[in-house]
Design a protein with these regions (language model features):
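Catalytic machinery of carbohydrate-active enzymes
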Residues: 1-241
Length: 241
């Protein structure tokens, strides 16, 4: 088949749908959009501002917004009873991970969908909006070097283990509901301090050059099992107890 010729099939992909999962599967979704006429994915309503922004360049992608995982499963169940363009020809899904296989969850996802894991990084793409990014930089009002810090009330960082002199910029819901608005702040930061979250995936996949930037993953703050922890390419310093 000619590489530019797409399979005339409408395929629904279903994987886990935290924002971190959506970022991990960016490359996977883009590979499928190259192969098939139409691709559909689910998206939890709270993540829609970021997910719709991330894929706004794709003309053959449908985003099925759901409010819960129960609604997602119900949509899949009734797919066979739909007609025309509302029906997917095929549903490809990974509903559970094999905790005992010793295989990292990200590798299980990409293996399940038949996409090389390297595409997580190599095919990752988001069309950035520099105007929105600059608006965030102006909004935080920090001039000079700073550190980008992302943690969670459930998984707080030890503030003694981050710079005591650099100003802190943190992504909050009040700042923006779109994680990609923070790309400019991220790439310019002198230091990055994060736990296992959507932001560590975004930072690791986002292609930018900042040779003096120091990256710190505060693993002690969120002891994610090794199989579930995001696979990383960039030169992170892992902070443990």
């Amino acid at each position: 088949m000619n590489q530019k010729e797409k399979v005339k099939s409408i395929v629904l992909l279903d994987f886990h749908h935290g924002m971190g999962d959506e970022l991990i599967c960016n490359g996977l979704v883009r590979e499928y959009c190259k192969r098939y006429e139409t691709i559909g994915i689910f998206c939890l309503k709270r993540n829609y501002p970021s997910v719709s922004f991330m894929y706004r360049d794709l003309t053959n992608l449908r985003i099925q917004v759901v409010n819960s995982h129960t609604e997602r499963m119900r949509f899949r169940l009734f797919n066979a009873f739909r007609f025309g363009q509302n029906r997917y020809d095929e549903v490809r899904a990974i509903d559970a991970y094999d905790d005992e296989s010793g295989i990292r969850f990200e590798r299980q996802i990409y293996n399940k969908f038949g996409v090389p894991l390297e595409k997580k990084w190599d095919s990752f793409f988001v069309e950035r909006d520099r105007t929105r990014e600059e608006a965030i930089i102006k909004k935080v009002g920090v001039s000079g070097p700073y550190q980008f810090v992302h943690d969670d009330s459930r998984f707080p960082l030890d503030r003694a283990r981050i710079s005591q002199t650099l100003p802190i910029i943190q992504p909050t819901k009040e700042l923006t509901n779109n994680v990609f608005d923070c790309c400019g702040v991220i790439e310019r930061a002198a230091e990055i301090h994060v736990v296992d979250s959507s932001f560590i995936v975004l930072i690791d996949c986002l292609p930018y050059v900042n040779e003096t930037q120091r990256l710190y993953k505060h693993q002690y703050a969120r002891a994610t099992p090794a199989a579930q922890s995001p696979m990383l390419r960039k030169p992170w310093t892992i902070l443990t107890l």
